[in-house]
Amino acid sequence: MEWRRAFSKKKLEEKVKNMDAKQATDYLLEKVDEQRNLENKLDKRLQNTRKKNKNKEKTRTWAEKYPPVDYYSPEFVENFMKDMRREEFEKSEERRGHKQVRLGSDNFVGDDPLKVLSEEALKAGFQHTGKVMKRFPADVFEKSKFIGMYDRHLTTLREKACCKKERNQIQSKLIQLRQLKPSCDFLAGTVSGVPGSGKSTLLKNVQKKLKNSVCLLANKELKGDFAGVPSVFSVEEMLLSAVPSSFNVMLVDEYTLTQSAEILLLQRKLGAKIVVLFGDREQGNTNKLTSPEWLHVPIVFSSDSSHRFGPETAKFCEDQGFSLEGRGGEDKIVKGDYEGEGEDTEVNLCFTEETKADLAEVQVEAFLVSSVQGRTFSSVSLFVRENDKPVFSDPHLRLVAITRHRKLLSIRADPEVWVSFMFATREGEEVDTHCYGEEHRPDEAE
């Protein structure tokens, strides 16, 4: 039955505009009850009227006699209904014995991808930070001015490309950057954890459970670790892919290895409505606008506990200013000279190409620390020379270097280098917030 509204839309909107969602919902539900009581009274009056007089003219509905003078706006009604659905969802969650962790705004509570992420993160031992995922407008690329700076950065790289293949790859990114239009608003949040906290395992579990999501690996060398997980690509693969793709959720592994503009370009290319970044914020470098941290994506889940190594490594990290808790098995850190005999280990690491070449001269194969972020080994030998100081002075890269092992870390360095390594800082380094990339033109500042 239609009935006249007893309350003015404008008055209700004015009343609830300064309330939070719960207060507004309680207030509006109370008014709904009052309106229903009024409806019942009117209905009874109409029934009595019909009994007394069968004349159709006299038994018109109350709404026909007195048409509504003030309808609610569609937006107001939609928001009101969302509040009601949210409250009903929260009540159902409480009845099942647990309270729903909210990652999104009221519009997104109970949405399947966010619920899966929440449940799996808590199950993996991650703590909810109390923050919700941040909503970004579809044109954030333009509003942040990253798009112009990234365009000039790619143009410079294309001009300096050393081969046709590299030039074509950069050109492909430029074409997409200039042709792709804003697709949709999106939510973004970060899952941050110390090395060994279980980020990759969590990511795999989330990706397996979601229906329309893609997992992007910043380190392409990790692709073998994701065997059996659907829709897994490297960031570079997806950026260069000519096949149109669309995913509701975009998950990025080791996001600190990506660039801020790459994340925005990928979101636009895929039309993703939810973007979740997985990584360790301590392993990122925020001194350049290329860092994803300049997007200010909130951390929604975090973990300071490592299951990879034990207390000795945790103490060693703490001595260098890194805070984490070692909950793994027995581990060991040993010191040795750069030259001479040392512990036999699964892999050798170093910081620079020069040190890598120096080791190759004596038939010692080594990998750069920057190439193994996200990977783990049973035992590691880390070779450090004095000439490596500009690189190992970066605390983010140093943390990667000393957390790749599970049982044994052998640091091979001469005594004078050891002191520099333990107390290294980036002297004179300045934050560069007006340009994008290592090399830029003077007119790049916006």
Curated annotation (Swiss-Prot):
Keywords: ATP-binding, Host cell junction, Host cytoplasm, Host cytoskeleton, Host nucleus, Hydrolase, Nucleotide-binding, Transport, Viral movement protein. The keyword Cell inner membrane does not apply. One of its GO terms (molecular function) is hydrolase activity. Residues 304-444 form the (+)RNA virus helicase C-terminal domain. InterPro entries: (+)RNA_virus_helicase_core_dom (IPR027351), P-loop_NTPase (IPR027417). GO terms for cellular component: host cell cytoplasm; host cell nucleolus; host cell plasmodesma; host cytoskeleton. It is found in: Host cell junction, Host plasmodesma; Host nucleus; Host cytoplasm; Host nucleus, Host nucleolus. Gene3D superfamilies: P-loop containing nucleotide triphosphate hydrolases (3.40.50.300). Residues 160-303 form the (+)RNA virus helicase ATP-binding domain. ATP binds at residues 193-200. It is an enzyme of class 3 (hydrolase). It catalyses: ATP + H2O = ADP + phosphate + H(+). Its cofactor is Mg(2+). Its EC number is 3.6.4.-. Residues 40-60 are annotated as: Disordered. GO terms for biological process: transport of virus in host, cell to cell. Homooligomer. Interacts with movement protein TGB3. TGB1-TGB3-TGB2 complex formation is enhanced by ATP hydrolysis. Interacts with the suppressor of RNA silencing (via N-terminus). Participates in the transport of viral genome to neighboring plant cells directly through plasmodesmata, without any budding. Multifunctional movement protein with RNA-binding, ATPase and helicase activities. Engages in homologous interactions leading to the formation of a ribonucleoprotein complex containing plus-sense viral RNAs (vRNPs). ATPase activity is probably required for vRNPs movement complex assembly. Intracellular delivery of TGBp1-containing vRNPs to plasmodesmata is facilitated by TGBp2 and TGBp3. Belongs to the virgaviridae/benyvirus TGB1 movement protein family. This is Movement protein TGB1.
